[in-house]
Amino acid sequence: MDISRRAVGTAAIGTVVVTSSLAVAERANAQASTESTFDRVKQSKVLRVAALPGESPYFNKNIATSEWTGMAVEMAKNIATSFDAKVEYLESTYGNSVLDLQSGKIDLAFALNPTPQRALVIGFSRPVFMHGFGTVAKKGFEPKTWGDLNKPDIRIAVDIGSVHELAARNFASKGEIIGLKTRDECVLAVQTGRADCVILAVILGLTAVKKNPALGKYIVLRDPFVQLPNCMGVRYEVDKRWRDFLDNWADYNRGAAQIRKWMIDGLALNGVMPEDIPSQVGF
């Protein structure tokens, strides 16, 4: 079973704070340039991308050189090449990148789940990849299924308002769910013994384990196998050429296994080797 059929429709909690009404969204869009994104990138030769500090392996910033690396950075460069353009990065957050798209500050945002709440205010490309879900547990605890977590004596850390929380409440509701503000707090809760495990998507979980040797292994949970599309966010426009281009770009590079290469290379920058990636995971 896929969470995209069962649970995404109820994802009112979302993963970001978006505008409170469509009227606000419309005002933000009205302030953006009337020039289409496709024409703007083609003519200016600049692709403006939301860069997310601390969100490795999508984005890694070298403090000394201010250079950006990571899987999303390589994807952005490849997209820009099609327009003979350079990439310009605007530091942002997941939540602010939605607002930045609406106001026309950026042309593209990476690594967004297309929740119904977000889709009220921005558009999305077709999936860049499907992002599976699992858990990082304390050492000695190795659950295999959601049922292994769905017990009153299991303490499950989740970041409040995230799809991680949504999955936990749908499939492990009998567990003691501990809501915390950030993913880092959730990981710390497992390290310090406050929680038995934390729910994380594959990319985030694998990276967390490499950063924190005191944690147990990352495990993709089964029954059900939960996964969500990971997409690129764009501004809603009458001219559909930009989103059409990104759809074709995603389909082509996913089919050619180039997305997989960028993913593996980005994970390697954070110490995650191909052999660390669970066999159930496919990019």
Indicate residue ranges for each PLM-predicted region.
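Extended ligand-binding regions for polar small-molecule ligands
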Residues: A32, V73-S82, G147, S162, ...
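N-terminal secretory signal peptides and thylakoid transit peptides that target proteins
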Residues: M1-V16, A23-N29
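A ligand-binding cleft/hinge motif common to bilobed small-molecule-binding domains
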Residues: G95-N96, L112-V121, A167-N170, D196-V226
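Short helix-initiation/N-cap motifs at beta->coil->alpha
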Residues: Y89-L99, I178-L188, T192, L228
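Flexible hinge/capping segments at coil-to-helix
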Residues: A137-R155
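Extracytoplasmic small-molecule ligand-binding "clamshell" domains
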Residues: A32-L112, L120
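Periplasmic-binding protein-like
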Residues: P53, M130-A137, V202, L206, ...
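Ligand-binding clefts/hinges and TM-proximal coupling segments of bilobed small-molecule sensing domains
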Residues: A32, V163-L180, K217-V220, A250-F283
